[in-house]
């Protein structure tokens, strides 16, 4: 299994932004250089990227299809993208616009039966289910919905197993407490999921801050990591992240001299 580093761009009103813990009122705007940033991702060695339509995530109706077409043609990157996916037609339109995978988040929690139908219709390589989670006082991983203001009845473990049984291949999981905080991913939740649904390829999301976090995700057996704020703020060099993601394979260990310090601790 190749480990994939997904540089991420969240788009709102045509600009690259980041939300802190998913809060639209706590937004940092960077610039409107969306295509140049994607080209820079490709130049740094990335083969995939993660693209989010924040306008659609709030109001529905994916708006980035023209940009997606331009981006895939100009960069050669494979793109997983989502935001506001509400119907099977939405999935089809986004795939037709050039997406390699469509990311489905809120609906995957609220209407899992529908999303499983789409998974089976389009195939497991074309869908990424994204589950945002928060651990409650009792240690249970809950699934907040509706802008994280309500909590779904289903828990993370139940829903992950349901999707795994239906053939899901790609699961992106975000610990809400770490999202946009540059405090490091909560590897406990990913270790838990790896044991629970070992056949699913797991993507780490939320809190990544440096190359050591990339290596930690790889060494934990995850399939990839989404990098957002750390890249935008220059705390992490994408080229180094891609290189480290490719060498830190626990099934093919290299001598310590061939790895950087975080792996050889």
Swiss-Prot record:
Q: What is its main location?
A: cytoplasm
Pull one GO CC term from this UniProt entry: cytoplasm
Active site: residue positions? 10 (proton acceptor), 132 (proton donor)
Q: Could you list this entry's UniProt keywords, alphabetically sorted.
A: Amino-acid biosynthesis, Cytoplasm, Histidine biosynthesis, Isomerase
Cell compartment(s), UniProt: Cytoplasm
Q: Which GO terms describe its biological process?
A: L-histidine biosynthetic process; L-tryptophan biosynthetic process
Record pathway = Amino-acid biosynthesis; L-histidine biosynthesis; L-histidine from 5-phospho-alpha-D-ribose 1-diphosphate: step 4/9
Give the domain of life. Answer: Bacteria
Query: Which InterPro entries is this protein grouped with?
Result: Aldolase_TIM (IPR013785), His_biosynth (IPR006062), HisA_bact_arch (IPR006063), Isoase_HisA-like (IPR044524), Isoase_HisA-like_bact (IPR023016), RibuloseP-bd_barrel (IPR011060)
EC annotation from Swiss-Prot or TrEMBL: 5.3.1.16
**Enzyme class, UniProt record, top EC level:** isomerase
| Reaction equations catalysed | 1-(5-phospho-beta-D-ribosyl)-5-[(5-phospho-beta-D-ribosylamino)methylideneamino]imidazole-4-carboxamide = 5-[(5-phospho-1-deoxy-D-ribulos-1-ylimino)methylamino]-1-(5-phospho-beta-D-ribosyl)imidazole-4-carboxamide
Q: Which GO terms describe its molecular function?
A: 1-(5-phosphoribosyl)-5-[(5-phosphoribosylamino)methylideneamino]imidazole-4-carboxamide isomerase activity
The family classification in the record reads: Belongs to the HisA/HisF family.
Q: Which NCBIfam families match?
A: 1-(5-phosphoribosyl)-5-[(5-phosphoribosylamino)methylideneamino]imidazole-4-carboxamide isomerase (TIGR00007)
| Name under which the protein is recorded | 1-(5-phosphoribosyl)-5-[(5-phosphoribosylamino)methylideneamino] imidazole-4-carboxamide isomerase
Question: Where does this protein come from, organism-wise?
Answer: Xylella fastidiosa (strain 9a5c)
